[in-house]
Amino acid sequence: MGKIKPDEIRSIIKQQIQQYQQEVASVTIGTVFQVGDGIAHIYGLDDVMAGELLEFQDNTIGIALNLETKSVGVVLMGDGTTIQEGSFVRATGKIAQIPVGAAFLGRVVNPLALPIDGKGEIKSDINRIIESPAPGIICRRSIHEPLQTGILAIDSMIPIGRGQRELIIGDRQTGKTAICIDTIINQKGKNIVCVYVAIGQKASSIAQVVNILQERGALEYTIIVAATADSPATLQYLAPYAGATLAEFFMYNGQHTLIIYDDLTKQAQAYREISLLLRRPPGREAYPGDVFYLHSRLLERAAKLNEKLGGGSMTALPVVETQEGDISAYIPTNVISITDGQIFLSADLFNANVRPAINVGVSVSRVGSAAQPKAMKQVAGKLKLELAQFAELEAFSQFASDLDQSTQKQLARGQRLRELLKQVQHSPLNLENQVSAIFAGTHGYLDVISIEHIPIFLVGLWQHLVNHKPKYGEILNSTNTFSEEAQAILIESLKYLTEEFLPPVK
């Protein structure tokens, strides 16, 4: 091996010096001077931005929420038990974002989009910011497509359109989650991606939802975002935004999505906890002043996009829990004013075995009727009015001793219509079955059937139409209208069944 001459060594060193590029990265460092209850106060982070992610020495991530004169208030995404006073904190220069994509379908993730179902890692190269801005006015178009829930009372009287925000409100244990799960099950085969966000719920309750969706074959098109009751308040606060971010990926790719926030009361409570620990001034019911903005910026992300942006949609079903039916409390009134209508569930109706326990008089959809299928509009137009008149008559009849024939007839029909709207959990109805049931009730074909036999009669009617009159279903599915031909087929079937299926009431 030849010796290297000193001149060659010198030229190599010079060459290396010329090629050397010095990379200097400046990192903003702060010091923890107080930590506890999921909150850390940092000194020295002068250039930090609102909402910026911060990294602690133990790799815990936090979000800068309070920017004060001499310190920064940070909410932690972990328990923070290993963070010590005096430890260093690094500003990342990023704001919260999560991976998104089709790989998340059928999975259960936490609000940071990390899998918690034991099925392995989720691989995705696409990231979206958690706090994405809502689509502007020009980006939207009016709601015109129906979103069928499969629940007769909702689809007929409180219809929901794709891109709408419909609040589900009621006391605890009145069937709010059941309506949401039934709606997800009913989207099977309709090319709709569903996102179910569970906020502050028991892990056992979330596991039950996962099992139901799996049994019904609905998990394959559903993403579940879970922030359990033992999760830090920060994750419970972020969970709905993470769910909206996952749904937005599909919406901006021209697909239809349905997102359920179960429930926003617990998110508001988590945000109240964070705000009080950060020493923000409390307002009504000790909530901070920006609790309205907390929900408005979330629910405004639901939209029906115009054709230029692909025509996708995000339909939001936020859930709010009331105390003793008090819808005039702070969070219920806030969310009612943001949404496009509400479905009110009554504890009294639930206890009276009217399930789903929807109070039709108080419930309203401000948009959905524009998106209701024509067939449903044709048969359900007078249903809400008839039920309202029946409720008034029923209250009056409790005080009256003798009622005339027409009043008795109206009461009998009202009782049958109420029975008609009862539905077994996890058994959503398709459009042709809904239309046939409402037509039978409003046109007096159930008047001769005893109330306890109505569910059996309806099942018999639906089976008869499928087995002997398939043309009826074909007309409704192909045209979405209740044509004269379909009406004639249905009347013929109803006449046959009222004579043959059950004996008339004596």
From Swiss-Prot:
Family: Belongs to the ATPase alpha/beta chains family.
Recorded GO MF terms: ADP binding; ATP binding; proton-transporting ATP synthase activity, rotational mechanism
Main localization of the protein described in the UniProt heading: plastid
Self-association and partners: F-type ATPases have 2 components, CF(1) - the catalytic core - and CF(0) - the membrane proton channel. CF(1) has five subunits: alpha(3), beta(3), gamma(1), delta(1), epsilon(1). CF(0) has four main subunits: a, b, b' and c.
Annotated site, Required for activity, chain positions: 363
Biological source species: Prototheca wickerhamii
Compartments where located: Plastid membrane
Disulfide cysteine pairs (residue numbers): none
UniProt binding sites for ATP: 170-177
Protein's UniProt keywords contain Mitochondrion: no
Name of protein: ATP synthase subunit alpha, plastid
